[in-house]
Curated annotation (Swiss-Prot):
The gene is ALF4. One of its GO terms (cellular component) is nucleus. Pfam families: Kinetochor_Ybp2. It comes from Arabidopsis thaliana (Mouse-ear cress). The lineage of its organism: Eukaryota, Viridiplantae, Streptophyta, Embryophyta, Tracheophyta. This is Aberrant root formation protein 4. PANTHER family: GLOMULIN. Required for the initiation of lateral roots independent from auxin signaling. May function in maintaining the pericycle in the mitotically competent state needed for lateral root formation.
């Protein structure tokens, strides 16, 4: 067992007298002469140091000695923790820890304990004792009682900063989940005890609590229910605080409460490992907090409610805004959970059918919803089931929506285009990596519908960004195929066709003449090259027919068939590509004749060669007419 040597600051008899005042038996002191050096067990040493702290405060000029004893006490506990950490399965050491914590609690609970001493110890003991909370259930209970004792005896505002500092330190402990439990429990009590400036105090504490909860959620063996209980306890305390306030401060505290609840929804959802339905009972308990602030599911899924909350609480404080990094994800998940279970909707007194109807009929709110769903669709930590429900919701709100509905020139989509683009980028990744064919099929349908819902002037900007940033030739091919399909739909309005046609040249050039320089890679980019050639071939034929019919709807036809653009395509795209394809085919046939990989490459290049020669023929024909 670890031994600790006593410092001979006081005589043994003096120390004994102080220990007796705390109810310590004579047998706790070994030795009988004033000059004897005493060697004690850890629990006895802790009692002695606490008694020395008490006696030094009573003596004139003893503050320096007091600080020294407190430092030694903390060092003693740290050393004890290090020894236990080295041999976590040593039951004997665990028993020693329980004895030490029990002695600390007894001394702190003594009626003779001086207030100055307990105030000074409060700056150190909550942090250092919380390390022992994960050793055993008994240790957890004792640490919680120690923290509660400080909360009861000390100034609430002091304890708020002390516990926040201890919580921040607990994030680095081996088991942040267990070690933070008594601190969070104590903090929930402190919130209620604060007498003034409640909002300012909570605004400092809540981000620290959220950081701890997020760290806990990332632990591999986290118990979601335990995590939720911790989070819910804090939420209940904040609600109790708001109920005691009036006017503006109450409104701010309620907004802060809503932000906290939305953020922990995201944290808890990410920690769920089995099925999405596991979050339903938890979200049902959170809904009353949100409805008490007047939040609605329409406001959550459009992001309007979270913007109002942030504006009220954070204002221009960018640093505080960063304390809620997952607020939009949480708001989206709250809505999706209501979609998963009618019980959640009932808890919020919401009718989701009316929300869907509103989104179907209101383009602006629908675009806002697209932007909010990107947080679910792009998350790498959520279960696929959440993403499946998000895709199904996209299909619900775009059902029956046509491109003509969103082409109202009075409605400006530019503010929402970045959010829609981010959502579609996540959708393209889902198409490639979804775990089953049904989800991939639904996601592809959602991609087509959302693209068609973007007003024509902005649709190309989104498509160009998707093609430019695509890292998959197959996905690039899919996107170019959608452009070709939109050109071929006779139901589209002229302005819609014009917007698509105007930018065909630029889209094709992105593939056939990559912006980073050099020729496209073969056979790696075969899918994208073939799709680009097919799109260009279709555009040439389409515009030729339109011109022959006298339907030059815009300058689009003359652009694609203009001598300048035809010569550019011929010299800069088609002829260099013809050389590249011919050399690639010849090289594969020559070097690896009969090899399966070689035959596969040739099989990829042959369709490209066929469409390429057809494009060259068409361009040469059009050039002759100029």
């Amino acid at each position: 067992m670890v031994k600790f040597a006593i410092i001979n600051t006081l005589t043994v008899n003096e120390t004994w007298a102080k220990l007796k005042s705390f109810g310590v038996m004579e047998s706790s002191i070994e030795g009988s002469s004033e000059s004897t050096t005493v060697t004690t067990s850890p629990s006895r040493r802790v009692r002695e140091l606490l008694a020395l702290c008490f006696s030094s405060v009573e003596e004139a000029g003893g503050f320096q000695d007091f600080e020294s004893f407190v430092t030694e006490l903390v060092s003693c506990l740290d050393s004890l923790y290090e020894n236990v950490a080295l041999d976590a399965n040593n039951e004997l050491e665990n028993d020693v820890i329980e004895e030490v914590l029990d002695e600390i609690l007894k001394v702190l609970s003594s009626p003779q304990m001086d207030q100055d001493v307990i105030d000074a110890l409060s700056f150190h003991l909550p942090k250092v004792t919380s390390k022992f909370a994960d050793i055993s259930s008994r240790c957890l209970q004792l640490v919680e009682e120690i923290v509660d004792r400080f909360v009861e005896a000390c100034n609430p505002r002091d304890m708020l900063s002390i516990l926040c500092e201890a919580l921040d330190a607990a994030r680095c402990y081996h088991s942040a989940s267990t070690c933070s439990t008594p601190l969070l429990h104590g903090l929930s009590k402190v919130f209620i005890l604060i007498q003034r400036r409640h909002y300012e105090q909570l605004k400092v504490a809540v981000p620290i609590v959220l950081n701890v909860l997020k760290d806990i959620s990332l632990e591999t063996d986290v118990q979601v229910e335990d995590l939720f209980d911790k989070a819910l306890g804090i939420a209940s305390s904040i609600r109790d605080v708001s109920s005691k306030l009036n006017n503006e401060e109450e409104a701010k505290v309620r907004c802060l409460l809503c932000l906290y609840v939305i953020q922990i929804t995201a944290i808890i959802s990410v920690s769920i490992r089995d099925k999405a339905a596991s979050c339903i009972p938890l979200v049902i308990q959170l809904e009353p907090f949100l409805t008490s602030c007047g939040l609605t599911h329409l406001g959550l899924i459009t992001g309007n409610d979270t913007e109002k909350l942030m504006s009220t609480v954070a204002g221009d404080d960018d640093e505080f805004i960063t304390s809620f990094p997952d607020i939009s994800l949480g708001a989206s998940l709250l809505f999706i959970c209501a979609k998963i279970s009618h019980e959640v909707a009932e808890a919020a007194n919401a009718v989701l059918g009316s929300v869907v109807d509103e989104l179907q009929n209101n383009p602006v709110k629908r675009w806002q919803a697209y932007g909010m769903l990107k947080y679910i669709l792009s998350s790498g930590d959520l279960l696929w089931e959440f993403k499946r429900h998000a895709i199904e919701f996209l299909l619900d709100i775009t059902k029956g929506v046509t491109s003509s509905q969103c082409n109202d020139e009075q409605i400006d989509c530019s503010d929402y285009t970045p959010g829609i683009y981010a959502t579609l980028q996540a959708v393209t990744l889902l198409i490639m990596y979804a775990p089953d064919a049904d989800l991939r099929k639904k996601t592809f349908e959602a991609l087509k519908r959302v693209l068609s819902d973007i007003p024509a002037p902005h649709r190309f900007d989104v498509l160009r960004a998707l093609v430019t940033n695509s890292r998959s030739p197959s996905m690039t091919a899919i996107l170019l195929g959608l452009v070709k399909d939109s050109m071929s739909k006779s139901s589209l309005q002229d302005t819609d066709c014009a917007a698509v046609d105007t930018h065909v040249i630029e889209l094709v050039e992105l593939v056939l003449r990559p912006p980073q320089g050099g020729p496209p890679l073969l056979p790696d980019q075969s899918d994208a090259i073939l799709a680009a050639l097919n799109l260009y071939r279709f555009a040439l034929l389409f515009e030729s027919r339109e011109c022959e019919a006298g339907k030059e709807r815009s300058k689009v036809g003359s652009d694609i068939l203009s001598k300048k653009n035809l010569e550019k395509a011929y010299k800069e795209w088609l002829l260099p590509l013809r050389t590249l394809v011919s050399c690639s085919i010849a090289e594969n046939l020559k070097e690896d004749h009969g090899q399966e990989s070689s035959l596969d490459d040739v099989g990829l290049l042959n369709p490209i060669e066929l469409v390429l020669y057809r494009c060259i023929e068409l361009v040469e024909e059009k050039l002759k007419s100029h």
